[in-house]
């Protein structure tokens, strides 16, 4: 059984490494999904494939879906891949995967991305995705301190940036966390919000979150 698993892992890695076209990449990703393997070597090979094909949205989307499926085993490899690569396109897909997973190990990175100054629309979108990841972490983690830190960072995102999309994402995340502290943050910010879309979303969130 061990030998068979080892051979299967080698085959999966080989298929990932040899995938030169988007069609081949999608087949290799499907094989990983079907195998449900959580071996680090296979996950690392999948990340390498994502780094090569991240500009093909269908391939990148499929890879992210599998990386989310393989969590929590995929979290550490995703974090390591982000730190070791400077390609912003590849990093954006990593952030999307980590935000969808919502593992507390990714909190510091997601918080860092939320606070990053942006030079273009794509980078701004990554910040919004990271903010949504903080909402998922803050609403599911059992550590109260982590939840409080998530609310603190989302509060910053709500009142500091000029990016209305980031503020909107922060509102949705605070509603997801849904604690009295989240309600207090939204309540204090709603009067000063200049964008009517964001302000309307704040009011909707406040109706759904308990004040105490």
UniProtKB/Swiss-Prot annotation:
The keyword Calcium does not apply. Keywords: Antenna complex, Lyase, Phycobilisome. InterPro entries: ARM-like, ARM-type_fold, Armadillo, PBS_lyase_HEAT. The keyword Lyase applies. GO terms for cellular component: phycobilisome. It comes from the Bacteria. Disulfide bonds: none annotated. GO terms for molecular function: lyase activity; oxidoreductase activity. SUPFAM superfamilies: ARM repeat. SMART domains: EZ_HEAT (SM00567). Belongs to the CpcE/RpcE/PecE family. An enzyme involved in the biosynthesis of bilin. This is Bilin biosynthesis protein PecF.
């Amino acid at each position: 059984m061990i030998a068979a698993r080892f051979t299967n892992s080698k085959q999966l890695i080989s298929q990932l490494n040899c995938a030169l076209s988007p069609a081949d990449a999608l087949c290799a990703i499907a094989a990983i999904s079907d195998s449900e393997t959580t071996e680090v070597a296979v996950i690392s090979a999948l990340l390498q494939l994502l780094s090569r094909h991240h500009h093909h949205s269908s391939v990148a989307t499929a890879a992210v879906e599998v990386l989310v499926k393989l969590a929590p085993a995929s979290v550490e490899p995703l974090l390591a891949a982000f730190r070791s690569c400077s390609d912003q396109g590849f990093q954006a897909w990593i952030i999307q995967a980590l935000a969808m997973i919502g593992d507390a190990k990714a909190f510091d990175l997601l918080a860092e991305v939320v606070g990053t100054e942006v030079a273009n629309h794509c980078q701004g979108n990554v910040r919004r995705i990271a903010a949504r990841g903080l909402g998922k972490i803050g609403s599911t983690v059992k550590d109260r301190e982590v939840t409080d830190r998530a609310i603190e960072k989302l509060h910053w995102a709500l009142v500091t940036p000029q990016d209305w999309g980031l503020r909107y994402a922060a509102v949705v995340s605070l509603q997801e966390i849904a604690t009295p502290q989240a309600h207090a943050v939204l309540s204090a910010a709603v009067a000063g919000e200049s964008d009517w879309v964001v302000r309307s979303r704040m009011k909707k969130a406040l109706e759904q979150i308990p004040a105490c």
